[in-house]
Amino acid sequence: MESEPKPFTQISQGKNKHTKIEEKPIKTNMNKEIKSTINKVKQSRNISLEQLKLLLEINDDEGIRFIREEAVKVCQKTYGNQVLIRGLIEFTNFCKNDCYYCGIRRSNSQADRYRLTKEQMLDCCASGYELGFRTFVLQGGEDGYFTDDKICDLVSAIKEKYPDCAVTLSIGEKSKESYKRYFDAGADRYLLRHETADEAHYKKLHPEEMSLAHRKQCLWDLKEIGYQVGCGFMVGSPGQTVETLYEDLQFIRELQPHMVGIGPFISQKDTPFADKASGTMEQTLKLLAIIRLIHPHVLLPATTALGTIHPKGRELGILSGANVVMPNLSPVNVREK
């Protein structure tokens, strides 16, 4: 008989890349249909549209905590109580794209733009390494200033200085040739949120020149090259429905990524979606739990956006099945830009 995970009571960071998560388990008298559905999803590692609707409609505190606790059990069975720590370096907020939801879209004349130098980025890595970080995530908009040569030079410099570290890139859609160059320079992982797997929904979020088919192809190219790949989506974005979320989950199941990054849509005042309601923490936590039930081995970050909408958002994400946090190593003066 499978043993229950041991109860725990605190969140604490060790001296290297792991954090222990701890919460006392709860007792619940959840209705049989929800319990049965969670067990079926967990066992089949798949979910039907009807099952997704049922789980997303859970709106009582007891029910939400129950699905979160089940997800934590699944996560513990694979990873124990460890949470992986990645150091995030946001090195540019220039972007050629004009996504309707994004604060760094090219049309946003109010954005306070910046670029970090190679030296600044290496300083960020040095600070992170001293703190015990062994993965650095280089994230930025699709900024033409950072040519393939510059990216390759940066990746090579980090790998040369810190050969025991992994380098993750999150710099958008590139050609397969560019992705291969970064990989050959030493990049290990690549994060590219697909944002939505539904064609009509994608068109509501992006201008005409952007294509869901191309974005998906980028993810397949990255996998073929040999990267550990991450995809993901926003929760509560304008036009999102249970049906589009179901498409997201089916695409993730098809892609089988190494990481899935989800977080609430947050309305940004200088975008066309300024007047749209933001996504909720409750729905995000439920979806984190659902993804964990379907994908026991996936790396699942508790994102910055969760921490933005709730002071303990990232901790609650961990206690919903997430197992990665990415503290920001960027210089303090650019973190809010």
Task: Give a label for each model feature.
Residues 4-8, 21-94:
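Flexible, acidic/Gly-rich N-terminal and inter-domain linker regions that tether
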Residues 44, 71, 99, 138, ...:
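Conserved, mostly hydrophobic/aromatic
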Residues 47-49, 59, 78, 285-337:
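C-terminal accessory regions of radical SAM enzymes
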Residues 106-121, 128-149, 154-219, 228-235, ...:
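Core AdoMet radical
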Residues 162, 194, 213-273, 283-301, ...:
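Conserved C-terminal portion of the radical SAM core fold
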Residues 175-182, 238-251, 308-319:
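Catalytic cores of alpha/beta
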